[in-house]
């Protein structure tokens, strides 16, 4: 009985602390604080090794892109891209910038809609985000999708 009570206390304490994820001195990237900043048709990516939720959200038209870098949700500007996401295996490389922040993203298509399925508007991918801010750098591997 005593072991069960101690275990319950440890689980409750650990569970409470694990609900708050933020960048640490060793890590630049954390889950977005506002997980609903962008709704509808969008880019999204998650990295369970970083924490629960999205690490990247972007408007489908690239008018707004967000990552939590250094403990704050940062608006990123898309500055360049090349490649495509049309078929499985395709690669798209994109560069985003914000004040003092550089993000190089490399997306690789893992799934596309079946041919002839006009109601499907999603492409799934793996992505590697190489993030730098000042002298700090971090690479985050994530999975995500783009579409409606």
Model-derived features: where do they sit?
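Cysteine-centric segments in proteins
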Residues: 23-148
